[in-house]
Amino acid sequence: MTDHYEINTIGVLTSGGDAPGMNAAIRAVVRTALANGLTVRGIRRGYHGLLREEIIEMSGRDVADTIQRGGTILQTARSQQMRTPEGQLKAASILKKYGIQALVVIGGDGSFAGAQKLSDYGINVIGIPGTIDLDIACTEYTIGFDTAANTAMEAIDKIRDTSTSHERCSIVEVMGRDAGYLALWCGIANGAEYILLPEQHGYDEQAMINDIIEKRKRGKKHYIIINAEGVGDSINMAKRIEEATGVETRATILGHLQRGGSPTVKDRVYASIMGAKAVELILEGKTNRVVGYQDGHYIDFDINDALKMNKEIPEYQLDIAKIL
């Protein structure tokens, strides 16, 4: 059995937007902790639930038959109160009240920012990256991205079928307010004619319209445009393109469809290993870390350093997308 460094009780919560694979991570945290003699307290509805003391003790039975389920069994929510010093102090006090000596937070940058604030009040926090946006800079992988990308890819394949039949231009809006990884990967996987990303800081709509008109003259009959939600309104974009080109254009917003569904093998396995890694870090006495994956290895970063990192889409991926 691992040396516990006087740790006997840990907590786990999911925060922010849900992502497929979160249950696999929760399951791994609980099972690894129990295997090492720790007590696990699950916190429902993220920081919102923490501030309301929605805290339960978890057993192996609580995570049985959950690895294949989408969403999060602990549920999730966003909390404005947690953004305030008063809320952060209250949250830390509640954790101490329940004897929680270390907290595992599964979520994105916003969730990690909340965790970092808790560390200022003496709470040991360990972050696990869970977001379909793939926008956490310290890791090449985030829980949920693979499932969301596959869900979107399958939907776009179906949209192309009907777009081809009706000789239409189809705009498909995928999630990604500030990050375009989902749009880029789906654009490459689906052979989209155009991919619009927030990282491009705007796009030349007139050039795209001119290109559609020119390709129409050469005999091309259908088009797929992948639009990340942070770029602009897909419905009005469709109206403008149809008016300018004469090509019937429809917009489809995939929305929260991308967050649901049974996680892929990759999301289940990576989430499971990250969950186990988080508990191992606690048992090793490490504090205030974020679990990550880089170059084939599971690693960890100081949470303060992780939050300072910026993630940019590699130029070669953008270049490949233009060619393909």
What are these regions (language model features)?
Residues 2-3, 50-103, 110-111, 143-150, ...:
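Glycine-rich oxoanion-binding loops at beta->alpha junctions
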Residues 2-51:
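N-terminal phosphate-binding or glycine-rich loops at protein starts, especially the Walker A/P-loop
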Residues 19-29, 51, 85-86, 100-116, ...:
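Short glycine/serine/threonine-rich phosphate/pyrophosphate-binding segments
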Residues 38-44, 162-169, 221-225, 248-254, ...:
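Flexible, glycine/charged-enriched surface loops at secondary-structure junctions
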Residues 41, 119-144, 196-200, 253:
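Short, acidic/small-residue loops that bind anionic groups at enzyme active sites
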Residues 105-107, 113, 117, 124, ...:
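Accessory alpha-helical/coil subdomains and C-terminal extensions
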Residues 245, 289-324:
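Phosphate-binding loop/pocket of nucleotide- and phosphate-handling active sites
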